[in-house]
Amino acid sequence: MRRHDPIVAIASAAGRGAIGIVRVSGNALGALAQALCGRALQPRMATYLAFRDARGQPIDQGLALYFPGPHSYTGEDVLELQAHGGPVVLQLLLARCLEAGAGADPATGRPCLPGLRLAQPGEFTERAFLNDKIDLAQAEAIADLIDASTEAAARSASRSLSGAFSAGIHGLCDALIALRTLVEASLDFPEEETDFLHQADARGQLSRLRQALGAVLQQARQGALLRDGIEVVIAGQPNAGKSSLLNALAGAELAIVTPVAGTTRDKVQQTIQIEGVPLRIIDTAGLRASDDEVERIGIARSWEAMAAADAVLFLHDLARAQTPKYIADDAEIERALARKLPPGVAVIDVWNKLDCVAAPAELAAPTAPTESAAVPPASARPAPAPRPAVQLSARTGQGLDGLRRILLEVAGWQSVPEGICIARARHVQALQMAAAHLEQAADQLQARGAALELLAEELRLAQNALDSITGAFTSDDLLGAIFARFCIGK
């Protein structure tokens, strides 16, 4: 399988629709277009015609569009056949393309398009990248635009697709190249009396570059949050109102709510958005000791979900909060949270059923008794940082806005002006790596003397990290992993 083979695929979504598209990309598609359409096509003009099989029998009627390269999506010749969006019709058109490609061109006697094959997922966009129609960040933005779950994510992906995010990276690279030029000049001409670095204020340039990179990194973190969101698990004792809270946050009756404890046996999840940030909210089985095998399986899955989450809403029932058994059971869950949750999982105490009590309670996490005498007394230990806490009523909606604010804070979301671009975790990692190398470069520049070679190397590594974002410096393995996630035909 070669990158220059002509390729064909159904480019529209699977299933039935008003319109379906079959797309072909390759070099010299004129003969194939003639065979498929029965006439020569005028470039970049839609032609209405009948699509016929090899025997001249009609398949469908629709539009044919021909885009000669390099002025096309892929940079190669592109042919699009737009027909009615029935799966059978599109499969017939796809088969006809493959058949016509292998068939003889009446003018030459050779195949119309030798080597025409089915495209791999993302191969059309990969060719656009390889032919310099878009860079790697823009290619990823196409997939992110298709997969966007919120309006904010879609608009941010569109800005990245337009090249706004890449422009910021290119600006950093340009400043970095200018700085590298000074360092290389100092290395290549050590006998010169001119101090290139001092004369050009290399320290000032590096400081400004680090500040600019920090700003791009902060925006990239926000862009990645818009794309990926966070996963939040609702946990607590049975009948604390977990399913009611899920329904309240989702604004729909997704989970069954009854007075019977243990109604939820398995995970129920829904994606919501708060200020454009997607949050996957998961309702789980109530945590308690149980002899019911099915319920025990559900509880085990609850703990698995919590361990994989970004945040856990530990739900407490204000109506039962003063009863000894409830206090003891909550404390047992608290001990299990401390034992089972990995570092980094935020726990938020949510006191539900505010509508069932006469006055708000004093917010505090359940006390988990120590299990070992070896644990130092509280007076000898530093006080733990207070956990976020909120009182609310899932039934009336009172306090939900406060919970939403806390969730955004836990996610790390900051209100940013219009113009944020979508980003991915790999972009954030690359920017962090570049920042680390620039920090090392600043240390070397401060030392000066024999450290110029190390300074030059740190700057080179920083540029490699930035170039990996746009694809100027990228391994084939990374390209394969990125484009394999695209749908076929894109």
UniProtKB/Swiss-Prot annotation:
Which top-rank group of organisms is this from? Bacteria
The EC code for this enzyme is 3.6.-.-
Annotated residues that bind K(+) are located at 239, 258, 260, 263
SUPFAM superfamilies xref list:
P-loop containing nucleoside triphosphate hydrolases, TrmE connector domain
Q: Which cofactors does this gene product need?
A: K(+)
Q: Could you tell me where this protein is found in the cell?
A: Cytoplasm
| Any GO MF annotation of the entry | metal ion binding
Q: Which GO terms describe its biological process?
A: tRNA methylation; tRNA wobble uridine modification
Under the heading Gene3D superfamilies, the entry gives: P-loop containing nucleotide triphosphate hydrolases (3.40.50.300), Probable tRNA modification gtpase trme, domain 1 (3.30.1360.120), tRNA modification GTPase MnmE domain 2 (1.20.120.430)
- Entries under PANTHER family matching the protein: TRNA MODIFICATION GTPASE GTPBP3, TRNA MODIFICATION GTPASE GTPBP3, MITOCHONDRIAL
The protein's role, per its UniProt record: Exhibits a very high intrinsic GTPase hydrolysis rate. Involved in the addition of a carboxymethylaminomethyl (cmnm) group at the wobble position (U34) of certain tRNAs, forming tRNA-cmnm(5)s(2)U34.
Q: Describe, as the record does, how this protein assembles with itself and its partners.
A: Homodimer. Heterotetramer of two MnmE and two MnmG subunits.
What protein am I looking at? tRNA modification GTPase MnmE
Native organism is Verminephrobacter eiseniae (strain EF01-2)
What is the primary gene name for this protein? Answer: mnmE
